[in-house]
Amino acid sequence: MSEVEAAAGATAVPAATVPATAAGVVAVVVPVPAGEPQKGGGAGGGGGAASGPAAGTPSAPGSRTPGNPATAVSGTPAPPARSQADKPVLAIQVLGTVKWFNVRNGYGFINRNDTKEDVFVHQTAIKRNNPRKFLRSVGDGETVEFDVVEGEKGAEATNVTGPGGVPVKGSRYAPNRRKSRRFIPRPPSVAPPPMVAEIPSAGTGPGSKGERAEDSGQRPRRWCPPPFFYRRRFVRGPRPPNQQQPIEGTDRVEPKETAPLEGHQQQGDERVPPPRFRPRYRRPFRPRPRQQPTTEGGDGETKPSQGPADGSRPEPQRPRNRPYFQRRRQQAPGPQQAPGPRQPAAPETSAPVNSGDPTTTILE
């Protein structure tokens, strides 16, 4: 009986270990006691021992066989996708000439100098761009240096630079950067204290030294002119009352004290520029004709002027809108003066002249 039990135990152990090793799960084999197969019989005990471990094992390992395709798919990982950095490099530091490059679309082609092959280039592949250009680009007909890698649709260029690693020149259609400096936003500065409180601090006082130390730490605020549209709109604005005080006052010391007040009022409150000086409108100067001597004159009087002077009738005024009556006949006093005995003949020569034009006079 001992030999039959040993044979049954030998046949039971492989049946239990085969499915466990095929499934890849470690199982512990428990030895069958010698008294149990005797109850069911030798043949029955052997069959029970053989079927016992198979029934005790889970059904899942029995279905996972090496030939099952489900096991192969779940067991082997999928291959990783190839990234841009893992592209195989075909050549490095190759010189070529740019065939064409579209700045708007951001791509073009480079013709290799060694193999005369066209290589695709994208704007992201440009490593050293022109610092003056706003966009990355290469110029048409420019000689560049690049590396060739294998892309999805053919050869592609990467690490594009100028010959020797210098920056590329770039396309002439690419916009340039602005020449002005970049605007750096600054926090709003605290408004300085009014200058009125600083004027009495110049004298002796307990807090004068402390106030000077605080004011020296603050940086004086620089006045900035208002914008163009503000100047055009508020040129004739109301004038502050502080600006009129130095003009009305007679003391010369007042303008020196009130000058900083005007500046700070324009900076902090309104920033109104000083009004422009406009001269007062005046009529153009029109010289008036010189008036002839009246009855008070002595030697220069004429005969017709004496007639009305003797009476009560004054001499009529000359019209202003007729300038041709202002012409006077000037006569040299030396050679044309008549001697003493010729004075009685003066009425004969002067009568026909004054009869035609009463306004003309003769000066000696």
From Swiss-Prot:
Compositionally biased spans, kind Basic residues: 175-184, 277-289, 319-330
Gly residues bias locations: 38-50
Keyword set, alphabetical order: Cytoplasm, DNA-binding, Nucleus, Phosphoprotein, RNA-binding
Low complexity bias locations: 51-63
Biased composition (Pro residues): 185-195
Residues annotated with Phosphothreonine modification: 65, 76
BP term (GO), one: regulation of gene expression
Domain of life: Eukaryota
Post-translational modification: Phosphorylated during oocyte maturation and dephosphorylated following egg activation. Phosphorylated in vitro by a kinase activity associated with testicular mRNPs. Dephosphorylation leads to a decrease in its affinity to bind RNA in vitro.
Compartments, record wording: Cytoplasm; Nucleus
Feature: compositional bias, Basic and acidic residues: 209-218, 249-259
UniProt-annotated stretches for the region Required for mRNA-binding: 217-364
First-listed, main subcellular location of the protein, grouped into a coarse class: cytoplasm
Start and end residues of each CSD domain: 93-163
Biased composition (Polar residues): 65-74, 351-364
InterPro entries in alphabetical order: Cold_shock_domain, CSD, CSD_CS, CSP_DNA-bd, NA-bd_OB-fold
GO cellular component: cytoplasm; nucleus
UniProt GO molecular function: DNA binding; nucleic acid binding; RNA binding
Tissue localization of expression: Expressed in oocytes and testicular germ cells in the stage of spermatogonia to spermatocyte. Also observed placental trophoblasts, as well as in vascular smooth muscle cells in the pulmonary artery, myocardium, and skeletal muscle. Undetectable in epithelial cells in respiratory, gastrointestinal, and urogenital tracts. Up-regulated in various carcinomas and germ cell tumors (at protein level).
Positions of the UniProt region annotated as Disordered: 33-85, 155-364
Keyword RNA-binding appears in the UniProt entry: yes
Region: Required for cytoplasmic retention, residue numbers: 87-169
Biological role: Major constituent of messenger ribonucleoprotein particles (mRNPs). Involved in the regulation of the stability and/or translation of germ cell mRNAs. Binds to Y-box consensus promoter element. Binds to full-length mRNA with high affinity in a sequence-independent manner. Binds to short RNA sequences containing the consensus site 5'-UCCAUCA-3' with low affinity and limited sequence specificity. Its binding with maternal mRNAs is necessary for its cytoplasmic retention.
Assembly and oligomerization: Found in a mRNP complex with PABPC1 and YBX3. Found in a mRNP complex with ZAR1 and ZAR1L.
Protein name as catalogued: Y-box-binding protein 2
